[in-house]
Design a protein with these regions (language model features):
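Positively charged n-region of N-terminal signal peptides that target proteins for export
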Residues: 1-4
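Bacterial N-terminal signal peptides
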Residues: 7-21
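Compact, glycine-rich, soluble single-domain proteins
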Residues: 23-154
């Protein structure tokens, strides 16, 4: 049912999003990701950052990020990492995720344009960036499980 809903939303967004809007992701580039928390299952549409170039740029220079969308950074192996908000205009929640899909740590409401490092707090396979306030609003916390093909598939 969630996949059908996601497909319908993706098609609708193709016709409702204005062309050429910086910061909005094309529906064809988005993949579904689910987070199971105590408050329920939350579905996101994520853009993948898998190459070093994609990861270095991340969400830099974008002026907006719609609720329910995000960027998933896949490091291909577990490792400690740090992020920053240089050239990033949208405040974010950074969700650090282990290879088993469990959330290790959440850095909430990161400061736009800050060059202060935001550490993972341990080895992670991926980081999910979403609009600031999302984790608190949805009750997402450390220990919650993330479902996406990159987890437990290696």
């Amino acid at each position: 049912m969630r996949r059908v809903l996601f497909a319908v939303l993706a098609v609708v967004s193709l016709f409702t999003l204005p062309p050429g809007r910086a910061g909005l992701l094309a529906a064809a580039e988005l993949q579904p990701l689910e987070i199971a928390s105590k408050s329920g299952v939350h579905v996101f549409a994520v853009e993948m950052a898998v190459t070093p170039e994609e990861q270095a740029k991340g969400l830099m220079f974008r002026k907006q990020l719609p609720e329910g969308q995000g960027m998933l950074f896949d490091f291909h192996r577990e490792q400690p990492t740090s992020f920053w908000m240089k050239n990033t205009y949208v405040p974010l929640d950074m969700i650090f995720i282990r290879a088993d899909g469990r959330i290790l740590r959440i850095a909430e409401n990161t400061v736009p344009l800050s060059e202060t490092l935001v550490p993972s707090g341990g080895p992670v396979l991926a980081v999910l960036e979403v609009v600031a306030g999302t984790a608190k609003k949805l009750g997402i916390a450390a220990g919650d499980r993330v479902a996406h093909p990159i987890f437990n598939s290696r």
